[in-house]
């Protein structure tokens, strides 16, 4: 049992848990997409994962302005202006009534708050597939290290269950966190966005020196 880091019941914001994945490490894997990222890459494949907390996403090019979302919102947090809904996101309680009633799937709630125990229950469902294929669990994002305490809890529990672990990172992480997590990670998927220091800072907000320091340490 790994006990260098205290395990506690954390809640994590996740975008998705993808089972039977084949492209995020060896073998058959389950990928946990964590919410939150310190970068703002204009080419991001999962821009909805950049915010850490669950949030409402309106896909305007799908919206037909039918007004059903306004009618269903009992709190009056949606109003129709210029044929399209305007959302009071700060007052939204994420009841998801507007998401369910939208005929065009133009409203989507991104992110879910879930405990580490609930995540582990899902991960362990496919243990036999991991073992037979040389697979395991991959933590992605967003940036997995953004939710460090929750990530550490999950990594420890995975290693206690003898699961292969992989973490996908952009490298914009405090080195101390890398040092703590390294013994628990079997494989790093290190995504360097650009090698031009100034362009990297301008386009993504990342610091190349920090990223390369972490890469060298690993």
Q: Where do the protein language model's features map onto the residues?
A:
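Short, surface-exposed acidic/glycine-rich loop or hinge patches that mediate macromolecular interfaces
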Residues: 35, 63, 92, 113, ...
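Short, conserved beta-strand segments within well-ordered enzyme catalytic domains
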Residues: 31-33, 79, 138, 166
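Iron-sulfur (Fe-S) cluster-binding modules
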Residues: 1-11
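Iron-sulfur cluster-binding cysteine motifs and their immediate structural context
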Residues: 42-49, 68-87, 97-113
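Conserved AdoMet/S-adenosylmethionine-binding subsite of the radical SAM
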Residues: 117-218
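Extended, non-globular alpha-helical segments
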Residues: 58-64, 111-126
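N-terminal pre-triad scaffold of radical SAM enzymes
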Residues: 14-68, 85-94
């Amino acid at each position: 049992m790994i006990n260098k880091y205290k395990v506690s019941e954390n809640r994590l914001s996740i975008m998705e848990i993808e089972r039977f994945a084949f492209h995020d490490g060896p073998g058959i894997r389950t990928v946990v997409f964590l919410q939150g990222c310190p970068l703002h890459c204009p080419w991001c494949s999962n821009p909805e994962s950049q915010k850490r907390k669950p949030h409402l996403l309106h896909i305007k090019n799908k919206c037909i302005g039918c007004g059903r979302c306004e009618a269903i919102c009992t709190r009056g947090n949606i109003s129709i202006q210029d044929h399209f809904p305007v959302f009071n996101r700060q007052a939204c309680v994420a009841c998801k009534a507007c998401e369910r009633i939208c005929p065009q799937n133009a409203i989507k709630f991104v992110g879910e708050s879930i405990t580490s125990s609930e995540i582990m229950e899902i991960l362990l469902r496919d243990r036999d597939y991991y073992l037979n294929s040389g697979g395991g669990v991959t933590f992605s994002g967003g940036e997995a290290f953004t939710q460090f305490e929750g990530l550490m809890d999950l990594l420890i529990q995975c290693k206690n269950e003898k699961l292969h672990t992989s973490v996908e990172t952009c490298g914009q992480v405090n080195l101390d966190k890398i040092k703590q997590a390294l013994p628990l990670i079997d494989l790093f998927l290190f995504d360097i966005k650009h090698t031009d220091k100034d362009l990297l800072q301008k386009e993504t907000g990342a610091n190349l020196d920090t990223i390369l320091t972490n890469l060298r340490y690993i």
